[in-house]
Amino acid sequence: MNCLEGPGKTCGPLASEEELVSACQLEKEEENEGEEEEEEEDEEDLDPDLDPDLEEEENDLGDPAVLGAVHNTQRALLSSPGVKAPGMLGMSLASLHFLWQTLDYLSPIPFWPTFPSTSSPAQHFGPRLPSPDPTLFCSLLTSWPPRFSHLTQLHPRHQRILQQQQHSQTPSPPAKKPWSQQPDPYANLMTRKEKDWVIKVQMVQLQSAKPRLDDYYYQEYYQKLEKKQADEELLGRRNRVESLKLVTPYIPKAEAYESVVRIEGSLGQVAVSTCFSPRRAIDAVPHGTQEQDIEAASSQRLRVLYRIEKMFLQLLEIEEGWKYRPPPPCFSEQQSNQVEKLFQTLKTQEQNNLEEAADGFLQVLSVRKGKALVARLLPFLPQDQAVTILLAITHHLPLLVRRDVADQALQMLFKPLGKCISHLTLHELLQGLQGLTLLPPGSSERPVTVVLQNQFGISLLYALLSHGEQLVSLHSSLEEPNSDHTAWTDMVVLIAWEIAQMPTASLAEPLAFPSNLLPLFCHHVDKQLVQQLEARMEFAWIY
């Protein structure tokens, strides 16, 4: 429906059909209830003595003329069964009552004492204001949320209808998910006691004797939280309230008790009765285990270290005695006895055969302190004893090189041994180098290959070859070639071939490079092999 704004003019929809139907229903209900009820309610609303709030509003109006106009307007509206106006479309008493209440609420709209009609002109109080637009008036009735004034009391049914309309206009809450409306079939399956028992079992798993280690992040987080709460309490921002903390139940752990009796070396579980009344042990040959082997090796190493310490004490006495005396061989008989005793301790150590003696000597050289002992002892030894140690080191050079990978301490022996090399004969030299050229059984690699990859090994080998070339050149001018010369030639050719076959990067850099080494190879090998040897030796010497 549309409301009219003067002749031939229309405005927007006044109200929806639901609102008009509600108004008509309300009018019929009010006519059936009787006029007496309405008059009593109207008198109560207009009686200033019964309503103290009405007096306050009348006092707020202030002007007697305005106050009289308000009273006249209310009485006219309540006494007339219906008001007919060009813009009202025959609205009922209750509808006009509600309309007047709405206009009373709207502060921007000026107060109208009477509704305009064609016969009676509109009366204005105060300054003349432009008449409101009926379109705005109609839209306000439907869109503006109603606020009820204390000057008017709505009928209970009318109030209920308005409340229903308000609820229908408010947006409905989002629909719940269909599965949330269904009852949980697994609810209340456990009693409170059973739940507490399950929680206790779960909390027991959180127990720890070392919380800082087992639950570090939770402990750090809770300490920071407690510090923050303490700071807030000091600043007065927070009341002292005990915060929640994870408390695990304390359950004392039973001491570990092992009822099974274990006997070392027994097979399987031993019965308790056997412990109290043991049977005769089975005669069996004991077999060493890996742990026993480790213990034996450890004890043997301790014995070697003890040997070295004892020999070092003897060596310190010798060095202290020769400090202010002339060097050997000008020493007394007592000093010679001390050196001889130390040499025998180093060489034999009460071994019955040569293999055991050599093994004891190698054990001393396998320790860094043992290498230092031999290096400091060599200058005090006689010539024959020093040569004996030199030949032993040369014969077992591959083994010593492998054991020196971690320490790299064999270099301290090169200078003392270099002085001993000059005392070697050609026959002794061939005996020392023979162990480097023999091919071990079950191996395709000669020991000299390992020696060439170590700095001390290749330096000692070059020094021995240089001294052998000097000896051969001296003997060749005096005597005819013999078996030692032939063996020496074969030895040089074999070593030269091994050097030529080895990659240049694998060849170690020597501590000293003899000047007569390349002429030595030129005398015994062909020119092509000499060129290969020269290239490798120069590369190794440069880098």
Curated annotation (Swiss-Prot):
Its main location: cytoplasm. Keywords: Cytoplasm, Disease variant, Nucleus, RNA-binding. It holds the Pfam family PAT1. GO terms for molecular function: RNA binding. Residues 161-170 have a biased composition (Low complexity). InterPro entries: Pat1-like, PAT1_dom. Residues 24-60, 159-186 are annotated as: Disordered. GO terms for cellular component: cytoplasm; nucleus; P-body. Highly expressed in oocytes. Interacts with LSM1. RNA-binding protein that acts as a translational repressor. It is linked to Oocyte/zygote/embryo maturation arrest 4: An autosomal recessive infertility disorder characterized by oocyte maturation arrest that can occur at different stages of maturation. Some oocytes exhibit maturation arrest at the germinal vesicle stage and others at the metaphase I stage. Oocytes progressing to polar body I either undergo fertilization failure or, in those that are fertilized, early embryonic arrest. This is Protein PAT1 homolog 2. It comes from Homo sapiens (Human).
